[in-house]
Structures are given as structure tokens and as C-alpha cells.
């Protein structure tokens, strides 16, 4: 067990991938919670969430179909993940500008989910790369363990997302049941966009 932990803590590649995924997934889960506040308190229509999720899911499927073909032509996995992490983060951040309407929120999320699919295509391979590096460096095969760290990253992010969500709502002085307008609506919209946006931009 100690050797397995060491394979993550002292393996720079593995540690980078795990931390990056925790940050990314935290932003991802925060978005799903913030969607509820955005649709009810800013857009004023809970049905908007149905449109956003339906469109985003379709674009994510489309992204998963084309991503393998595109990624295979772009070269290095780390650079490709960084590139699409940047594009995904900016797509989420654009919610702050366009997200106060149903159409704007839907388009921004759909684009982000499309580009996110390119990261998902390569993400688990980065864990394998970290395992290959450790095998080359030490002669010890920890690849199965490192691949399992993907699930650990997801669960850690899920736990962190509730904390981050609470911090965001306190920071913007959110009041339940109030339809926001003006600067208050703008603040919540930016929080909705920057939550996942920073989650994808920071690991870049």
C-alpha cells in the first residue's frame, strides 16, 4: 500500500493529473448545482434547465464521436488536454456574459460540454502515461492502481463541490426564493460561469 501511495505522491505526472482532475471535476459538479439557481433566480424559468441539459448532452455525445479522430491528429496528449481545457474553461466563463437568457445559457453550456468531451477522451490515458513513466523510472508496475485514482479524483471532487458551492452562495449573498435583477443577477451569472470555468482553466 505504501508503494502505491508513493507512486502518486512522488510521481510528479500522476500527482499533476490527479490534482487537475479534482479541480476540473469540482467545477463540473458546482455547475450542476449552480444551474438550478441560474434558471430559477436569474432566468426565472426552471424549464430552462431542461433545455440546457438536453442540448449539452447532445453536444457532449457529438464531441465524444468526433474527439478520437481530432485528438489523434493533434499530437501530444498533455498539450491537447491543455488546449481543450482552455477552450472549455472560456466557454463556461462566457456564461457570465451571455448566460442571463435561456438561449445564451444553453449555447454556452453546449459548447463547453462539446469541448469537454475531447478532454474526457484522453483523460484516463494520462493516468496510464503516469504509470508508464513510473514503471520506466522504478521498474514497478503501478498502472492499475493509478488508473483507479481516476475514480478517487471524481469522488474527492464531488465532496469538495458542496463546499465550493456553499462558499459561492455566501460570497454573492444569495437569498432563496428571490428573482434577481440588475447587478445581483449579473453576479450570480458570473459565479455560475466562473465556477466550472476556473475549474477547467486553472489546471491548464
Question: Can you say where each PLM-predicted feature lies in the sequence?
Answer:
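Membrane-embedded alpha-helical bundles of multi-pass transporters/translocases
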Residues: 1-204
